Design a protein with these regions (language model features):
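Long, contiguous interaction/recruitment modules in multidomain scaffold/adaptor proteins
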Residues: 1-60
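Compositionally biased, intrinsically disordered low-complexity segments
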Residues: 14, 19, 77-80, 181
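Alpha-helical solenoid repeat scaffolds
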Residues: 37, 62-63, 67-69, 102-106, ...
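Structural signature of alpha-solenoid helical repeat junctions
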Residues: 56-57, 76, 94, 128, ...
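Alpha-helical adaptor scaffolds
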Residues: 66-126, 135, 151, 158-161, ...
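Terminal, low-structured helical/coil segments at or just beyond the last alpha-helical repeat
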Residues: 151-192
């Protein structure tokens, strides 16, 4: 019961944040943020996330966090990560893509064990899924675990062709991450 109340509280805070207007100096910057739904997203008021599905809420928060991380905005990453992870727990169904998103958020917030568990779960539920190897390889690189990184690279490369032929939508959505990890894996495999 406490978890439900906590979740409702997080969502309520998120609704308040999204529906109230930003301070005047930040209005222009906020309008161009991918989560804000301002002018850059087609104009008009911020989106009413109460009408969004749990997956849409989670994806919007994930996108905002990743954009902030790419721009070095640790404050946004820190502020929105708990909301995104709470939204993740509210998903009706959890697929490899959602687990991958949650794992990346956990990596950005220092929850390495949580990210590892999600990477393992991706591979347990979808053997050979490239996201599992990307998560586990990223964790291994962070931990300076050369054997773990080599294992992740090897698994990734051994499943790459078959997985790409599967035509998974999430692979198209994360093509850059897959390409970057593949290049790193091939560079590791090739003699210098």
């Amino acid at each position: 019961m406490l978890t439900g109340a906590l979740g409702a509280g997080v969502i309520a805070l998120l609704l308040i944040f999204l529906t109230r207007g930003p301070p005047a100096p930040a209005a222009e910057a906020a309008a161009s943020a991918p989560f804000a739904g301002g002018a850059a997203a087609g104009g008009g008021p911020p989106p009413d996330i109460s009408n969004m599905s749990p997956r849409e809420r989670f994806d919007r928060l994930y996108n905002r966090i990743m954009t902030a991380a790419e721009n070095g905005d640790e404050g946004t990453v820190t502020n929105f990560s708990p909301m995104a992870l709470q939204a993740y727990t509210m998903l009706d169904t959890v697929d490899a893509d959602a687990r991958y998103h949650a794992a990346l958020i956990k990596l950005h917030t220092g929850d390495i064990d949580g990210a590892t568990a999600l990477g393992d779960t991706i591979l347990a539920n979808s053997p050979g899924h490239l996201f599992g190897y990307i998560v586990l390889g990223t964790v291994a690189r962070f931990r300076k675990d050369d054997a773990g990184l080599k294992k992740a690279y090897s698994g990734f490369l051994s499943h790459y062709d078959a997985e790409m032929k599967a035509g998974r939508t999430e692979y198209t959505d994360h093509a850059r991450s897959i390409t970057d990890f593949k290049k790193a894996a091939e560079a590791e495999r090739s003699p210098a």
